[in-house]
From Swiss-Prot:
Subunit structure, as described in the record: Interacts with UL48.
Highest taxon above the source species: Viruses
Induction: Expressed during the late times of infection.
Organism: Human cytomegalovirus (strain AD169) (HHV-5)
Phylogenetic classification of the source organism: Viruses, Duplodnaviria, Heunggongvirae, Peploviricota, Herviviricetes
InterPro entries for the chain: Herpes_U59/UL88
Family: Belongs to the herpesviridae U59/UL88 family.
Main function: Plays a role in incorporating a subset of tegument proteins into the virion.
Keywords assigned: Host cytoplasm, Virion, Virion tegument
Subcellular location: Virion; Virion tegument; Host cytoplasm
Coiled-coil residues: none
Protein's name in the database: Protein UL88
Cellular component, GO annotation: host cell cytoplasm; viral tegument
Length: 429
């Protein structure tokens, strides 16, 4: 048992050492082993193996639930027992698993998340979870549930918010499903093969992503490495495909109602992070929130807009799609500067001239009050300085450029901490 636990720790990067519980539709046990579902079917295996190489413990014609989870989303390290399959992207997978010839979306539920498990510790940048007082345990089902879900056109869309149908879809009779126990080194092989670690400092070779000085990059790197869930070429391809369709107005008819709802939500955004149209800004922010495991519109937009995996090359993903990475980086840089204004707010007394007074009903002021809600002791001059920073940023789209032009760099050190909670708050603004 101790050897298995040691192997589990070694299979993960130091900042990713897992806690027991659900990871990508597979259940990590206290002894370091992984329990999950295995699907045996020749056509299904052939479909998945076109994209994912077999792990060292895979038998012929077998794929694992964690592989299907990644294949459908391109995301890693999701604290979830559930994953979605969209017809728009994966009609061939829907047919292989169920024999269904058309639907909008299937949800596969591999088990039950223990009621004592809380998703995030408030203010924790690493996204680690903690347990409550309830003794409810995570449970792996003997056979996964599979449900046909109506496409959501508003509100929260994550599996925690859907109303489950009274009856589930039937698995195809030639798909044999069993539960298996695996070594985590084998289960983790998929991540080690596909993950980019794009936000590591040594990968900082893309000029358009160098948005901060090296010392700020180093301060943000741990957050960006640990909080994101989509750091893979496959996820980049999905985002690129959906963004290309959105930009070219090449929208599938089945997605028209969803898109109409998103246009309204995009119009309500107060803060634009990139110099692109408002709907594209909203899409990129939702993709970032989806990476951060926030149940909003990101999954639904990607699922209903993205084409088949092989369509990514047409959309330009093969050349490296970076806009969602840039959006996440810009949000993190702005969070660092806003938090630094609060951390060193006493120094703002020396600003000459002082920032203009902020009107109480100013929409950006409302955003800032929500952003600073958990900081405590936020002074009026801090809100005014932050308002001026965001107003200048709206013209330049350069966080540090605005910070310097307003003279804040002479008074305030950009050395505050940034948490996942701050990122989420700014991306929602």
């Amino acid at each position: 048992m101790m050897e298995a636990a040691a192997a589990a720790a070694a299979a993960f990067r130091p900042e990713e050492r897992p806690t027991p519980g659900w990871h990508d539709a597979a259940l990590l046990m206290d002894d370091g082993t992984v329990r999950e579902h295995a699907f045996r079917n020749g056509p299904l295996s052939q479909l998945i193996r076109r994209v994912l190489p077999p792990p060292p413990d895979a038998e012929d014609d077998v794929v694992f639930a964690s592989e299907l989870c990644f294949y459908c989303s391109g995301r890693f390290n999701r604290r979830s027992s559930v994953f979605s399959i969209y017809w728009q992207k994966h009609s061939d997978l829907v047919y292989a698993l169920t024999g269904i010839t058309h639907c909008a979306k299937l949800v596969v539920e591999c088990g039950q998340l223990g009621s004592s498990r809380l998703r995030w510790r408030d203010g924790d940048a690493s996204g680690e979870e903690r347990r409550g007082d309830d003794d409810s345990r995570d449970e792996l089902y003997d056979v996964p549930g599979i449900y046909m879900i109506r496409v959501n056109d508003g509100g929260s869309t994550g599996p925690r918010h859907v109303i489950w149908p009274g009856t589930s879809v039937l698995w195809a009779p030639d798909v044999v499903i069993t539960t298996v126990q695996r070594r985590i080194s084998a289960a983790r092989a998929l991540v080690n093969t596909f993950r980019q670690y794009f936000f590591l400092l040594e990968r900082r070779s893309h000029e358009e992503l160098v948005l901060c000085p090296p010392e700020m990059e180093e301060r943000l790197a741990p957050l960006l490495q640990s909080a994101t869930r989509g750091d893979s070429d496959m996820f980049d391809g999905v985002v690129a495909s959906a963004y290309h369709r959105l930009r070219m107005s090449n929208i599938p008819r089945s997605s028209a109602r969803l898109l109409e709802h998103c246009v309204g939500l995009a119009g309500a955004k107060k803060l634009l992070l990139l110099d692109v149209p408002r709907l594209e800004n909203y899409f990129l922010c939702q993709v970032c929130l989806y990476e951060l495991d926030e149940d909003e519109m990101g999954e639904e937009m990607l699922g209903m807009l993205a084409g088949k995996p092989e369509d990514a090359a047409v959309s330009g993903a093969s050349g490296g799609f970076l806009l969602h990475r840039k959006t996440m980086k810009l949000a993190a840089c702005l969070c660092l500067l806003l938090n630094s204004l609060h951390l060193h707010q006493e120094a703002l007394e020396a600003l000459d001239p002082p920032p203009p007074r902020v009107e109480e009903n100013d929409l950006v002021n409302v955003v800032l009050r929500r952003y600073y809600r958990s900081h405590g002791g936020v002074q009026a001059r801090t809100l005014a300085a932050a308002r001026a920073l965001l107003a200048d940023y709206a013209e330049t789209f350069s966080p540090l450029g605005s910070f310097t032009r307003l003279g804040y760099d002479r008074l305030v050190s950009a050395d505050a901490g940034v948490s996942r909670r701050h990122l989420v708050a700014l991306l929602r603004a």
